[in-house]
């Protein structure tokens, strides 16, 4: 693991150790196996009498909880009227339930069902989940928004297997893509947002979230669970962690290397949280965008304490640079109120600080204003183009 403290003229490298285990499913006995890059040959049924039939998924599948949809459909609604005040964990996505019916030979001992999900019908990079043979469904979290998925189920034994036909479903194109990582609040993909009628921000590259350990603790207390670590490493494939918390007052909570284990780049980019956090952290914002322009750092996470203010600033600058409209940037900022953030946040508060600073910067569009501001603090035009190449995709 590489640890890098990013302060002007300081770069330190350290190493660490690893930890792994599971994502989430409909029961504690179902488990995420891997995000595999193998090519699978799909076995045929033993005969026509024995089969697995997948239940049809009608319409597009929504990843948001109903209370989240209420806000997304009417973003100017008073969140307190929905009971949203940052005191409860409401940031998790809605599970997608996949189910099937099976007729298996009684004289064969099948060990488990293997559920495969992929974005292509060749299953070249499937997500795999083991389900006990006595069960016939699983809850899936963290799929991309606006994406067509292929899936099948295979009953596995040491001797033979029975495989279903391949079916499909589509996730509803409704951002943000919020993520379930056990032990971490306020977790979502930076990607998925619409730029224009032809382009959007690519999903699966950068994630914003809350802390992974207890802040301001004199002893290290890791809050992300083993399940959460496994989700980060083996499902989201995280390579780098950017920590925006302060070091001088131990806001980092004695955290000196990534809790995600060995091989993860850990960058400390301490930012103050008082006043206009853009103006007061110019050098650190420059260093963070240096990291964002390095393709080798992806996929990555960045976070402060609760993943809202300093994390929200970086997200505003990044997605605004890419061309996401300002109203969507405000929606993403206020979506943090669903997390366990011990308070509420309003777009009105940031309009008076860093949003105002950017609005007063030269440029015709928000993207141009942010680009010009970043260049004023030392980011090059080539770095900006690299960031756009990394994140912008056609759809």
What kind of feature is each model-predicted range?
Residues 13-16:
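C-terminal motif of bacterial Sec signal peptides marking the signal peptidase cleavage site
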Residues 303:
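Residues at the beta-strand->loop junction immediately N-terminal to the Walker
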Residues 23-44:
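N-terminal, intrinsically disordered, polar/charged segments of Gram-positive cell-envelope systems
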Residues 18-20:
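Bacterial signal peptide processing site
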Residues 306, 310-311:
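Ser/Thr-glycine-rich phosphate-binding loops at phosphate-binding pockets of nucleotides
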Residues 2-9:
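Sec-dependent signal peptide recognition
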Residues 1-2, 206:
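Intrinsically disordered, low-complexity sequence elements enriched in Ser/Thr/Gly/Pro
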Residues 40-300, 313-395:
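Cys-dependent protein tyrosine phosphatase-like superfamily
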């Amino acid at each position: 693991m590489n640890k890098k403290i990013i302060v002007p003229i300081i770069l330190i490298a350290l190493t660490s150790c690893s930890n792994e285990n599971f994502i989430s499913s409909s029961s504690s006995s179902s488990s995420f196996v891997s995000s595999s890059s193998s090519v699978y040959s799909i076995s045929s049924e033993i005969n026509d009498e024995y089969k697995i039939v997948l239940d049809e998924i009608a319409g597009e599948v929504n990843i948001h909880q109903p209370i989240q949809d209420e806000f997304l459909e009417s973003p100017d609604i008073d969140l307190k009227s929905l009971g949203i005040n940052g005191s409860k964990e409401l940031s998790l996505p809605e599970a997608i339930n996949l189910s099937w019916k099976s007729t298996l030979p009684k004289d064969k001992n099948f060990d488990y069902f293997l559920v495969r999900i992929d974005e292509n019908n060749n299953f070249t990079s499937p997500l795999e989940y083991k389900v006990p043979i006595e069960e016939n469904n699983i809850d899936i979290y963290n799929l991309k928004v606006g994406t067509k998925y292929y899936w099948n189920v295979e009953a596995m034994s040491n001797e033979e297997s029975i495989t279903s036909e391949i079916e499909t479903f589509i996730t509803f194109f409704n951002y943000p893509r919020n993520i379930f990582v056990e032990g971490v609040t306020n977790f979502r993909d930076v990607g998925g947002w619409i730029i224009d009628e032809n382009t959007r921000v690519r999903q699966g590259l950068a994630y914003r979230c809350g802390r992974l350990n207890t802040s301001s603790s004199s002893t290290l207390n890791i809050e992300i669970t083993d399940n959460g670590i496994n989700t980060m490493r083996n499902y989201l494939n995280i390579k780098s962690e950017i920590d925006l918390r302060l070091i001088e007052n131990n806001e980092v909570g004695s955290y000196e290397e990534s809790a995600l284990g060995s091989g993860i780049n850990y960058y400390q980019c301490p930012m103050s949280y008082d006043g206009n956090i853009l103006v007061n952290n110019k050098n650190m914002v420059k260093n963070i965008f240096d990291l964002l322009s390095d393709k080798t750092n992806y996929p990555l996470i960045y976070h402060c304490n609760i993943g809202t203010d300093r994390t929200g600033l970086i997200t505003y600058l990044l997605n605004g640079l890419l061309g996401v409209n300002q109203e969507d940037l405000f929606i993403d900022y206020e979506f943090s109120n669903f997390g366990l953030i011990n308070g509420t946040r309003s777009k009105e508060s940031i309009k008076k600080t860093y949003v105002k600073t950017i609005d007063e910067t030269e440029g015709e569009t928000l993207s141009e204003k942010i680009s010009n501001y970043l260049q004023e603090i030392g980011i090059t035009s080539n770095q900006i183009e690299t960031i756009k190449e990394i994140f912008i995709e056609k759809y």
